[in-house]
Amino acid sequence: MARAKRVKRDSATNIYRTCKQAGTCPPDVINKVESTTIADKILQYGSAGVFFGGLGISTGKGTGGTTGYVPLGEGPAVRVGNAPTVIRPALVPDTIGPSDIIPVDTLNPVEPTTSSIVPLTDSTGPDLLPGEVETIAEIHPGPTRPPPDTAVTTSTNGSSAVLEVAPEPTPPSRVRVTRTQYHNPSFQVITESTPTTGESSLADHILVTSGTGGQTIGGSTPELIELQDFPSRYSFEIEEPTPPRRTSTPIQRIQNIIRRRGGGLTNRRLVQQVNVENPLFVSRPSRLVQFQFDNPAFEEEVTQIFEQDIDTFNEPPDRDFLDIKTLGRPQYSETPAGYVRVSRLGKRGTIRTRSGTQIGSQVHFYRDLSTINTEDPIELQLLGEHSGDATIVQGPVESTFIDINVDENPLSEDFSAHSDDLLLDEANEDFSGSQLVVGGRRSTSSYTVPRFETTRSGSYYVQDTKGYYVAYPEDRDTSTDIIYPTPDLPVVIIHTFDTSGDFYLHPSLSRKFKRRRKYL
Protein backbone atom coordinates (compact mmCIF):
# COMPACT_ATOMS: atom_id res chain seq x y z
CA MET A 1 0.00 0.00 0.00
CA ALA A 2 1.42 3.36 -1.04
CA ARG A 3 1.84 5.91 1.68
CA ALA A 4 0.05 9.22 1.17
CA LYS A 5 2.25 12.17 0.42
CA ARG A 6 2.43 14.71 3.21
CA VAL A 7 1.21 18.15 2.18
CA LYS A 8 2.78 21.17 3.81
CA ARG A 9 0.49 23.29 5.94
CA ASP A 10 -0.22 26.91 5.12
CA SER A 11 1.44 29.71 7.07
CA ALA A 12 0.21 30.50 10.57
CA THR A 13 -0.98 33.99 9.56
CA ASN A 14 -3.29 32.70 6.76
CA ILE A 15 -4.67 29.92 8.94
CA TYR A 16 -5.39 32.38 11.74
CA ARG A 17 -7.44 34.65 9.41
CA THR A 18 -9.75 31.85 8.27
CA CYS A 19 -10.16 29.89 11.49
CA LYS A 20 -10.42 32.68 14.06
CA GLN A 21 -14.06 33.47 13.29
CA ALA A 22 -15.04 29.79 13.24
CA GLY A 23 -13.05 29.05 16.42
CA THR A 24 -11.23 26.06 14.94
CA CYS A 25 -7.64 27.38 15.14
CA PRO A 26 -4.96 25.05 16.48
CA PRO A 27 -3.37 26.15 19.79
CA ASP A 28 0.10 26.58 18.30
CA VAL A 29 -1.22 28.97 15.62
CA ILE A 30 -3.04 31.10 18.20
CA ASN A 31 0.02 31.28 20.50
CA LYS A 32 2.30 32.20 17.64
CA VAL A 33 0.13 34.93 16.19
CA GLU A 34 -1.08 36.39 19.49
CA SER A 35 2.46 36.16 21.06
CA THR A 36 1.32 33.95 23.94
CA THR A 37 4.05 31.34 23.73
CA ILE A 38 6.21 30.44 26.72
CA ALA A 39 9.10 32.55 25.42
CA ASP A 40 6.83 35.57 24.93
CA LYS A 41 5.45 35.23 28.46
CA ILE A 42 8.95 35.10 29.90
CA LEU A 43 9.81 38.34 28.09
CA GLN A 44 6.58 39.99 29.22
CA TYR A 45 7.02 39.08 32.87
CA GLY A 46 10.72 39.92 32.82
CA SER A 47 10.20 43.34 31.23
CA ALA A 48 7.99 44.30 34.15
CA GLY A 49 11.01 44.26 36.49
CA VAL A 50 13.90 45.04 34.09
CA PHE A 51 13.92 47.83 31.52
CA PHE A 52 15.94 47.34 28.34
CA GLY A 53 14.58 50.30 26.44
CA GLY A 54 16.73 51.85 23.75
CA LEU A 55 18.88 48.75 23.28
CA GLY A 56 16.90 47.33 20.40
CA ILE A 57 16.45 43.86 21.94
CA SER A 58 13.60 42.43 19.90
CA THR A 59 12.91 40.17 16.99
CA GLY A 60 12.90 43.09 14.57
CA LYS A 61 15.73 44.63 12.63
CA GLY A 62 18.78 45.89 14.47
CA THR A 63 18.34 49.66 14.40
CA GLY A 64 19.41 50.28 17.98
CA GLY A 65 16.06 51.63 19.15
CA THR A 66 15.05 55.24 19.08
CA THR A 67 18.50 56.58 19.94
CA GLY A 68 20.59 54.24 17.79
CA TYR A 69 23.70 52.33 18.80
CA VAL A 70 25.87 54.27 21.22
CA PRO A 71 29.47 53.10 21.87
CA LEU A 72 30.53 52.91 25.49
CA GLY A 73 32.09 56.08 26.87
CA GLU A 74 30.88 58.38 24.06
CA GLY A 75 28.04 60.79 23.51
CA PRO A 76 24.80 60.24 21.63
CA ALA A 77 24.94 58.62 18.23
CA VAL A 78 24.58 60.44 14.93
CA ARG A 79 21.79 59.29 12.69
CA VAL A 80 22.44 59.09 9.01
CA GLY A 81 20.10 61.19 6.84
CA ASN A 82 18.89 63.66 9.49
CA ALA A 83 19.65 67.37 9.51
CA PRO A 84 22.90 68.29 11.29
CA THR A 85 22.64 69.83 14.73
CA VAL A 86 23.86 73.42 14.98
CA ILE A 87 26.29 73.87 17.86
CA ARG A 88 25.73 77.18 19.59
CA PRO A 89 28.53 78.90 21.49
CA ALA A 90 28.22 79.03 25.23
CA LEU A 91 29.73 82.57 25.56
CA VAL A 92 28.22 85.78 24.27
CA PRO A 93 30.33 87.20 21.42
CA ASP A 94 31.89 90.62 22.04
CA THR A 95 31.96 93.44 19.54
CA ILE A 96 35.25 94.27 17.87
CA GLY A 97 36.40 97.77 18.77
CA PRO A 98 38.88 99.80 20.79
CA SER A 99 39.61 98.73 24.32
CA ASP A 100 38.41 100.72 27.29
CA ILE A 101 41.85 100.74 28.88
CA ILE A 102 43.39 103.43 26.63
CA PRO A 103 41.08 106.44 25.98
CA VAL A 104 40.65 107.47 22.36
CA ASP A 105 40.19 111.16 21.61
CA THR A 106 37.75 112.16 18.92
CA LEU A 107 39.06 114.36 16.15
CA ASN A 108 37.22 117.44 14.98
CA PRO A 109 36.27 117.65 11.32
CA VAL A 110 39.04 119.17 9.20
CA GLU A 111 38.17 122.40 7.45
CA PRO A 112 39.71 123.50 4.16
CA THR A 113 41.23 126.60 5.71
CA THR A 114 43.05 124.77 8.53
CA SER A 115 46.74 124.09 8.36
CA SER A 116 47.92 120.66 7.35
CA ILE A 117 50.75 120.71 9.89
CA VAL A 118 49.93 118.69 12.98
CA PRO A 119 51.86 119.86 16.06
CA LEU A 120 53.59 117.15 18.09
CA THR A 121 52.80 116.81 21.76
CA ASP A 122 54.62 114.82 24.43
CA SER A 123 52.39 112.26 26.01
CA THR A 124 53.31 109.89 28.78
CA GLY A 125 51.87 106.42 28.49
CA PRO A 126 51.14 104.05 31.34
CA ASP A 127 54.23 102.63 33.09
CA LEU A 128 54.09 98.89 32.75
CA LEU A 129 57.33 98.19 34.69
CA PRO A 130 57.09 97.33 38.38
CA GLY A 131 57.98 100.05 40.84
CA GLU A 132 60.50 100.05 43.63
CA VAL A 133 60.12 97.32 46.20
CA GLU A 134 60.76 98.38 49.76
CA THR A 135 62.90 95.93 51.76
CA ILE A 136 63.05 96.06 55.53
CA ALA A 137 65.81 94.05 57.32
CA GLU A 138 65.44 93.45 61.03
CA ILE A 139 68.45 92.29 63.07
CA HIS A 140 67.73 90.67 66.40
CA PRO A 141 70.71 90.54 68.79
CA GLY A 142 71.56 87.19 70.36
CA PRO A 143 71.07 86.41 74.02
CA THR A 144 73.75 87.95 76.20
CA ARG A 145 75.61 85.65 78.54
CA PRO A 146 76.72 86.82 81.99
CA PRO A 147 80.49 87.17 82.37
CA PRO A 148 82.13 84.22 84.13
CA ASP A 149 83.14 84.70 87.73
CA THR A 150 86.91 84.77 88.00
CA ALA A 151 88.28 83.90 91.43
CA VAL A 152 91.14 86.13 92.64
CA THR A 153 93.63 84.67 95.11
CA THR A 154 95.40 87.18 97.44
CA SER A 155 98.29 86.61 99.83
CA THR A 156 99.32 88.70 102.89
CA ASN A 157 102.86 87.37 103.35
CA GLY A 158 105.87 88.74 101.56
CA SER A 159 106.11 86.00 98.93
CA SER A 160 106.03 86.69 95.24
CA ALA A 161 102.66 87.25 93.68
CA VAL A 162 101.14 84.32 91.83
CA LEU A 163 98.34 85.07 89.44
CA GLU A 164 96.09 82.13 88.54
CA VAL A 165 94.20 82.70 85.35
CA ALA A 166 91.23 80.45 84.78
CA PRO A 167 90.73 79.25 81.20
CA GLU A 168 87.88 80.64 79.26
CA PRO A 169 84.91 78.32 79.04
CA THR A 170 84.65 76.65 75.67
CA PRO A 171 81.22 77.11 74.12
CA PRO A 172 79.48 73.82 73.40
CA SER A 173 79.83 72.68 69.82
CA ARG A 174 77.25 70.68 67.97
CA VAL A 175 78.55 67.73 66.01
CA ARG A 176 76.45 65.86 63.50
CA VAL A 177 77.58 62.48 62.30
CA THR A 178 75.99 60.99 59.20
CA ARG A 179 76.38 57.52 57.82
CA THR A 180 75.66 56.34 54.31
CA GLN A 181 75.31 52.64 53.65
CA TYR A 182 75.00 51.13 50.19
CA HIS A 183 73.42 47.75 49.74
CA ASN A 184 75.65 45.27 47.93
CA PRO A 185 73.85 42.01 47.06
CA SER A 186 77.13 40.14 46.45
CA PHE A 187 78.48 40.91 49.93
CA GLN A 188 77.08 39.20 53.00
CA VAL A 189 77.95 40.54 56.42
CA ILE A 190 78.80 37.89 59.01
CA THR A 191 77.15 39.13 62.17
CA GLU A 192 78.57 36.37 64.35
CA SER A 193 82.27 35.61 64.26
CA THR A 194 85.28 35.71 66.52
CA PRO A 195 87.15 39.02 66.20
CA THR A 196 90.91 39.16 66.13
CA THR A 197 93.13 40.65 68.80
CA GLY A 198 92.68 44.39 69.22
CA GLU A 199 89.29 44.64 67.54
CA SER A 200 86.37 46.00 69.49
CA SER A 201 83.82 46.19 66.69
CA LEU A 202 82.90 43.81 63.92
CA ALA A 203 80.55 44.30 60.99
CA ASP A 204 77.61 46.42 62.20
CA HIS A 205 78.02 45.63 65.90
CA ILE A 206 79.75 48.14 68.21
CA LEU A 207 80.69 47.06 71.73
CA VAL A 208 81.01 49.87 74.27
CA THR A 209 82.76 49.09 77.59
CA SER A 210 82.86 51.46 80.55
CA GLY A 211 85.09 50.66 83.51
CA THR A 212 87.25 47.63 84.10
CA GLY A 213 86.31 46.67 87.65
CA GLY A 214 83.25 46.14 89.75
CA GLN A 215 81.94 44.22 92.71
CA THR A 216 78.59 42.49 92.99
CA ILE A 217 76.91 42.48 96.39
CA GLY A 218 74.22 39.91 97.03
CA GLY A 219 73.03 37.03 94.93
CA SER A 220 71.89 37.22 91.37
CA THR A 221 68.23 37.80 90.63
CA PRO A 222 66.59 34.48 89.82
CA GLU A 223 64.60 34.06 86.64
CA LEU A 224 60.92 34.62 87.15
CA ILE A 225 59.93 32.39 84.23
CA GLU A 226 61.64 29.61 82.40
CA LEU A 227 63.54 31.07 79.48
CA GLN A 228 64.44 29.31 76.28
CA ASP A 229 67.63 29.90 74.32
CA PHE A 230 66.97 30.71 70.69
CA PRO A 231 69.55 29.13 68.38
CA SER A 232 71.58 31.24 66.03
CA ARG A 233 70.82 31.26 62.34
CA TYR A 234 74.17 29.54 61.69
CA SER A 235 73.43 26.58 63.98
CA PHE A 236 70.90 24.00 62.91
CA GLU A 237 70.27 20.30 63.25
CA ILE A 238 69.25 17.86 60.58
CA GLU A 239 66.70 15.34 61.77
CA GLU A 240 67.07 11.94 60.18
CA PRO A 241 63.73 10.31 59.35
CA THR A 242 62.85 7.01 60.89
CA PRO A 243 63.02 4.71 58.99
CA PRO A 244 65.56 6.35 56.65
CA ARG A 245 64.32 7.35 53.22
CA ARG A 246 65.47 5.40 50.22
CA THR A 247 64.62 7.95 47.53
CA SER A 248 64.66 11.72 47.33
CA THR A 249 61.02 11.89 46.14
CA PRO A 250 59.12 8.98 47.71
CA ILE A 251 56.00 9.21 45.55
CA GLN A 252 53.92 6.11 45.02
CA ARG A 253 52.90 7.23 41.55
CA ILE A 254 56.47 7.25 40.26
CA GLN A 255 57.07 3.77 41.64
CA ASN A 256 53.97 2.45 39.88
CA ILE A 257 55.15 3.87 36.54
CA ILE A 258 58.57 2.25 36.95
CA ARG A 259 57.06 -1.12 37.85
CA ARG A 260 54.64 -0.98 34.93
CA ARG A 261 57.46 -0.16 32.51
CA GLY A 262 59.70 -2.95 33.73
CA GLY A 263 56.94 -5.57 33.84
CA GLY A 264 57.21 -6.39 30.12
CA LEU A 265 60.95 -7.07 30.32
CA THR A 266 60.68 -9.65 33.07
CA ASN A 267 58.19 -11.87 31.23
CA ARG A 268 60.12 -15.13 30.96
CA ARG A 269 57.67 -16.67 28.50
CA LEU A 270 58.33 -14.06 25.81
CA VAL A 271 61.73 -12.57 26.65
CA GLN A 272 64.95 -14.41 27.45
CA GLN A 273 66.58 -13.21 30.70
CA VAL A 274 70.38 -12.77 30.67
CA ASN A 275 72.34 -11.43 33.64
CA VAL A 276 75.45 -9.55 32.46
CA GLU A 277 78.45 -9.53 34.81
CA ASN A 278 80.73 -7.40 32.66
CA PRO A 279 80.80 -3.76 33.90
CA LEU A 280 81.13 -2.48 30.30
CA PHE A 281 77.42 -3.17 29.90
CA VAL A 282 76.62 0.07 31.76
CA SER A 283 78.93 2.43 29.83
CA ARG A 284 80.01 0.76 26.55
CA PRO A 285 77.66 -2.12 25.66
CA SER A 286 78.69 -2.07 22.00
CA ARG A 287 82.12 -3.46 22.93
CA LEU A 288 80.39 -6.65 24.09
CA VAL A 289 78.72 -7.20 20.71
CA GLN A 290 81.56 -6.60 18.27
CA PHE A 291 85.13 -5.39 18.14
CA GLN A 292 85.29 -1.72 17.27
CA PHE A 293 87.05 1.53 18.04
CA ASP A 294 85.73 3.67 20.89
CA ASN A 295 84.58 7.24 20.38
CA PRO A 296 84.79 9.15 23.68
CA ALA A 297 82.46 11.88 22.40
CA PHE A 298 79.65 9.40 21.69
CA GLU A 299 77.35 8.41 24.53
CA GLU A 300 75.61 5.10 24.02
CA GLU A 301 72.25 6.20 25.39
CA VAL A 302 70.24 5.39 22.26
CA THR A 303 69.13 2.28 20.44
CA GLN A 304 72.03 0.68 18.54
CA ILE A 305 71.72 -1.34 15.36
CA PHE A 306 74.51 -3.77 14.44
CA GLU A 307 74.74 -4.70 10.76
CA GLN A 308 76.23 -8.15 10.35
CA ASP A 309 76.13 -10.56 7.46
CA ILE A 310 74.65 -13.86 8.51
CA ASP A 311 76.79 -15.77 6.03
CA THR A 312 79.97 -14.79 7.88
CA PHE A 313 80.31 -15.89 11.47
CA ASN A 314 82.00 -13.38 13.79
CA GLU A 315 82.73 -14.35 17.35
CA PRO A 316 81.58 -11.54 19.71
CA PRO A 317 83.68 -10.51 22.72
CA ASP A 318 80.95 -11.91 24.98
CA ARG A 319 79.10 -15.13 24.12
CA ASP A 320 75.86 -13.81 25.65
CA PHE A 321 75.66 -11.19 22.87
CA LEU A 322 75.86 -13.67 20.00
CA ASP A 323 73.82 -12.74 16.88
CA ILE A 324 72.59 -9.50 18.45
CA LYS A 325 71.01 -7.29 15.79
CA THR A 326 69.45 -4.51 17.86
CA LEU A 327 70.28 -3.31 21.37
CA GLY A 328 67.87 -0.84 22.97
CA ARG A 329 68.60 2.14 25.14
CA PRO A 330 69.06 1.69 28.90
CA GLN A 331 66.08 1.48 31.24
CA TYR A 332 66.36 1.87 35.00
CA SER A 333 64.17 0.06 37.50
CA GLU A 334 64.21 -1.13 41.09
CA THR A 335 64.51 -4.74 42.15
CA PRO A 336 62.48 -6.23 45.02
CA ALA A 337 65.68 -6.26 47.09
CA GLY A 338 66.06 -2.49 46.65
CA TYR A 339 68.91 -2.41 44.09
CA VAL A 340 69.00 -0.29 40.94
CA ARG A 341 68.81 -2.40 37.77
CA VAL A 342 70.06 -1.29 34.35
CA SER A 343 68.18 -3.10 31.56
CA ARG A 344 68.52 -3.19 27.76
CA LEU A 345 66.19 -5.03 25.40
CA GLY A 346 67.99 -6.76 22.54
CA LYS A 347 66.88 -8.73 19.51
CA ARG A 348 68.78 -11.55 17.89
CA GLY A 349 69.02 -12.19 14.15
CA THR A 350 69.54 -15.95 14.16
CA ILE A 351 67.49 -17.13 11.15
CA ARG A 352 67.15 -15.47 7.75
CA THR A 353 64.39 -16.37 5.32
CA ARG A 354 64.62 -16.41 1.53
CA SER A 355 63.03 -12.98 1.35
CA GLY A 356 65.85 -11.55 3.51
CA THR A 357 63.92 -11.21 6.76
CA GLN A 358 65.88 -12.07 9.89
CA ILE A 359 64.04 -13.81 12.71
CA GLY A 360 65.27 -14.03 16.27
CA SER A 361 64.21 -14.01 19.89
CA GLN A 362 64.09 -11.04 22.24
CA VAL A 363 66.65 -10.93 25.04
CA HIS A 364 66.52 -8.91 28.25
CA PHE A 365 70.05 -7.98 29.34
CA TYR A 366 70.22 -6.60 32.87
CA ARG A 367 72.77 -5.81 35.55
CA ASP A 368 72.12 -4.93 39.19
CA LEU A 369 74.26 -2.13 40.58
CA SER A 370 76.09 -2.77 43.83
CA THR A 371 75.31 -1.11 47.13
CA ILE A 372 76.97 2.20 47.98
CA ASN A 373 78.19 1.87 51.54
CA THR A 374 77.63 4.95 53.65
CA GLU A 375 80.72 6.07 55.50
CA ASP A 376 80.70 7.60 58.94
CA PRO A 377 80.04 11.33 58.78
CA ILE A 378 83.02 13.61 59.28
CA GLU A 379 82.59 16.66 61.42
CA LEU A 380 83.36 19.65 59.24
CA GLN A 381 84.60 23.03 60.39
CA LEU A 382 83.58 26.38 59.02
CA LEU A 383 86.29 28.32 57.22
CA GLY A 384 86.31 31.97 58.25
CA GLU A 385 83.09 31.75 60.26
CA HIS A 386 82.54 30.75 63.87
CA SER A 387 79.19 30.69 65.59
CA GLY A 388 78.67 30.71 69.33
CA ASP A 389 81.10 32.23 71.77
CA ALA A 390 83.00 35.39 70.91
CA THR A 391 86.26 36.46 72.54
CA ILE A 392 87.29 40.10 72.78
CA VAL A 393 90.78 41.01 73.92
CA GLN A 394 91.20 44.50 75.33
CA GLY A 395 94.77 45.69 75.24
CA PRO A 396 94.78 48.39 77.98
CA VAL A 397 93.19 46.09 80.56
CA GLU A 398 95.25 42.94 80.13
CA SER A 399 98.80 44.19 79.66
CA THR A 400 102.08 42.55 80.63
CA PHE A 401 105.15 44.64 81.47
CA ILE A 402 108.61 43.07 81.24
CA ASP A 403 111.59 44.76 82.88
CA ILE A 404 114.53 44.40 80.52
CA ASN A 405 118.04 45.53 81.33
CA VAL A 406 119.47 47.09 78.21
CA ASP A 407 123.06 46.90 79.41
CA GLU A 408 122.98 43.11 79.78
CA ASN A 409 123.05 40.87 76.72
CA PRO A 410 121.45 37.50 77.56
CA LEU A 411 122.77 35.91 74.37
CA SER A 412 126.42 36.47 75.17
CA GLU A 413 128.09 33.87 77.43
CA ASP A 414 131.42 34.29 79.20
CA PHE A 415 133.78 31.53 78.14
CA SER A 416 137.46 31.74 78.72
CA ALA A 417 139.86 31.04 75.93
CA HIS A 418 141.13 27.73 77.42
CA SER A 419 137.95 26.52 79.17
CA ASP A 420 136.98 22.85 79.06
CA ASP A 421 133.31 23.78 78.94
CA LEU A 422 133.61 24.26 75.20
CA LEU A 423 134.18 20.50 74.80
CA LEU A 424 131.00 19.49 76.56
CA ASP A 425 128.21 18.10 74.41
CA GLU A 426 124.98 19.56 75.71
CA ALA A 427 122.76 17.87 73.12
CA ASN A 428 120.37 15.30 74.58
CA GLU A 429 120.15 12.19 72.45
CA ASP A 430 116.77 10.49 72.48
CA PHE A 431 116.63 6.90 71.22
CA SER A 432 113.05 6.20 72.26
CA GLY A 433 111.87 5.80 68.65
CA SER A 434 114.96 4.05 67.27
CA GLN A 435 115.21 0.48 65.96
CA LEU A 436 118.20 -1.86 65.95
CA VAL A 437 118.53 -3.99 62.81
CA VAL A 438 120.86 -7.00 62.90
CA GLY A 439 121.59 -8.86 59.67
CA GLY A 440 121.63 -8.05 56.00
CA ARG A 441 117.96 -7.37 55.50
CA ARG A 442 118.55 -4.23 53.56
CA SER A 443 119.27 -4.62 49.89
CA THR A 444 122.92 -4.00 49.03
CA SER A 445 123.97 -2.52 45.73
CA SER A 446 126.60 -4.29 43.67
CA TYR A 447 129.05 -2.16 41.67
CA THR A 448 131.47 -3.45 39.02
CA VAL A 449 134.95 -1.89 39.12
CA PRO A 450 136.84 -2.31 35.82
CA ARG A 451 140.53 -3.38 35.86
CA PHE A 452 142.92 -2.33 33.16
CA GLU A 453 145.88 -4.48 32.01
CA THR A 454 149.09 -2.42 32.27
CA THR A 455 152.82 -3.03 32.83
CA ARG A 456 153.29 -0.02 35.02
CA SER A 457 153.06 0.17 38.76
CA GLY A 458 149.76 -0.58 40.32
CA SER A 459 147.10 2.04 39.62
CA TYR A 460 143.50 1.56 40.50
CA TYR A 461 140.28 3.03 39.25
CA VAL A 462 137.68 3.71 41.91
CA GLN A 463 134.13 4.69 41.01
CA ASP A 464 132.59 7.39 43.18
CA THR A 465 129.27 6.03 44.38
CA LYS A 466 128.71 8.31 47.39
CA GLY A 467 130.45 6.08 49.92
CA TYR A 468 133.79 4.76 51.18
CA TYR A 469 135.47 1.87 49.37
CA VAL A 470 138.87 0.28 50.00
CA ALA A 471 140.81 -1.10 47.01
CA TYR A 472 143.32 -3.89 47.85
CA PRO A 473 146.25 -4.65 45.48
CA GLU A 474 146.36 -8.04 43.78
CA ASP A 475 149.30 -10.28 42.95
CA ARG A 476 149.79 -10.51 39.18
CA ASP A 477 152.15 -13.51 39.28
CA THR A 478 149.44 -16.00 40.14
CA SER A 479 147.99 -17.88 37.27
CA THR A 480 144.42 -17.14 36.44
CA ASP A 481 142.19 -19.81 35.00
CA ILE A 482 140.90 -18.52 31.72
CA ILE A 483 137.84 -20.19 30.31
CA TYR A 484 138.03 -20.08 26.56
CA PRO A 485 134.89 -20.33 24.45
CA THR A 486 133.98 -23.69 23.00
CA PRO A 487 134.75 -24.33 19.33
CA ASP A 488 132.11 -23.32 16.84
CA LEU A 489 130.55 -26.68 16.21
CA PRO A 490 127.22 -27.09 14.49
CA VAL A 491 124.30 -27.99 16.63
CA VAL A 492 122.17 -30.93 15.73
CA ILE A 493 118.57 -29.81 15.25
CA ILE A 494 115.81 -32.38 15.30
CA HIS A 495 112.52 -31.45 13.66
CA THR A 496 109.60 -33.39 15.04
CA PHE A 497 107.13 -32.13 12.44
CA ASP A 498 108.54 -34.41 9.75
CA THR A 499 106.47 -37.59 9.66
CA SER A 500 108.52 -39.28 6.91
CA GLY A 501 110.97 -42.07 7.66
CA ASP A 502 114.01 -40.20 6.32
CA PHE A 503 116.14 -37.71 8.25
CA TYR A 504 116.70 -34.02 7.58
CA LEU A 505 120.26 -32.77 7.44
CA HIS A 506 120.88 -29.28 8.67
CA PRO A 507 122.39 -26.99 6.00
CA SER A 508 125.37 -26.26 8.24
CA LEU A 509 126.38 -29.94 8.15
CA SER A 510 126.31 -30.24 4.40
CA ARG A 511 129.62 -30.29 2.53
CA LYS A 512 130.57 -27.11 0.89
CA PHE A 513 131.69 -27.34 -2.71
CA LYS A 514 133.98 -24.76 -4.13
CA ARG A 515 133.11 -23.37 -7.48
CA ARG A 516 135.68 -24.01 -10.11
CA ARG A 517 136.10 -21.41 -12.70
CA LYS A 518 136.86 -22.36 -16.19
CA TYR A 519 139.66 -20.38 -17.69
CA LEU A 520 139.24 -19.56 -21.28
UniProtKB/Swiss-Prot annotation:
Region ranges (Disordered): 139-176
Signal peptide bounds: none
Keyword DNA-binding on entry: yes
Cystine crosslinks: C19-C25
GO CC annotations on file: host cell; host cell endosome; host cell Golgi apparatus; host cell nucleus; viral capsid
Subunit structure as annotated in this protein's UniProt entry: Interacts with major capsid protein L1. Interacts with E2; this interaction inhibits E2 transcriptional activity but not the DNA replication function E2. Interacts with host GADD45GIP1. Interacts with host HSPA8; this interaction is required for L2 nuclear translocation. Interacts with host importins KPNB2 and KPNB3. Forms a complex with importin alpha2-beta1 heterodimers via interaction with the importin alpha2 adapter. Interacts with host DYNLT1; this interaction is essential for virus intracellular transport during entry.
Protein name listed in UniProt: Minor capsid protein L2
Gene this protein is translated from: L2
